[in-house]
Amino acid sequence: MAHSQVGIQLISESTEKTLAELIALCAEHNIIHNEKSPLALVQTDDRLELRKLDEPKLGAVYVDFVGGTMAHRRKFGGGRGEAVAKAVGIKGSALPTVIDATAGLGRDAFVLAAIGCQVRLVERHPVVFLLLQDGLNRAYQDEEIGEMLQQNLHLLNVQHINELDPNSDYADVVYLDPMYPHKQKSALVKKEMRVFQHLVGADLDADELLLPALQLAKKRVVVKRPDYAEFLCGKQPHFSRETKNHRFDIYMGASQC
């Protein structure tokens, strides 16, 4: 994977995985140790996590598909009634194949996979890629959901969807949720998002995602946006689905026009 180099503190608090092993893993993804970075990628005995060392109260960012928020969402969430499920076109027995081209921490993708969709993940930031990979590997071992996730949720070893071939790597739906500069009020709501945005920043080239997404999608491209954000590429969608704080802009694929 050809990533531009990322400098971040690398720390091991694990009794099983050494700092040398963490450094070697990161080197494969062009991540190097930078002791001056306020961000740290930390290997604990349980997981890989991201911390903002100068703001410890923000807590750690990590991927957990088994417990916490995702367990609650799986058991008590809306399932097929969730906004993201409706946006990608889940209806009756129709379960579209999905490429989530801006996977982030994988939460929307997990919801779709738990419903039964085959979902492939693309994540271009190398640190987020490692967090996702770690979370998936742990979830694959879970007795309750491991087998389902091994069948339905896979992380692709590519950096950008323009590396995928529309003739062979297509899907029914391509899902885009590019990072967008948050209004200060909303940025303070989720502490985790502040850590994440410090690492990733806004997707300033998010407009470059729409064309390759349209080429890969047989049925539709779904773009999740804050309700105050402009359309991706300034391109009017065929229609939108609105929620309390977001909207899903939906562009029908060539076969559906």
Curated annotation (Swiss-Prot):
Record has Cytoplasm as a keyword: yes
Enzyme Commission (EC) number: 2.1.1.242
Binding-site residues for S-adenosyl-L-methionine, renumbered to this chain: 107-108, 123-124, 177
Pfam families linked: SAM_MT
Predominant subcellular localization, coarse grouping: cytoplasm
A single MF term (Gene Ontology): rRNA (guanine-N2-)-methyltransferase activity
Top EC class, one word: transferase
Record's protein name: Ribosomal RNA small subunit methyltransferase J
InterPro entries per record: 16SrRNA_methylTrfase_J, SAM-dependent_MTases_sf
Source species: Haemophilus influenzae (strain 86-028NP)
Lineage of source species: Bacteria, Pseudomonadati, Pseudomonadota, Gammaproteobacteria, Pasteurellales
Catalytic activity: guanosine(1516) in 16S rRNA + S-adenosyl-L-methionine = N(2)-methylguanosine(1516) in 16S rRNA + S-adenosyl-L-homocysteine + H(+)
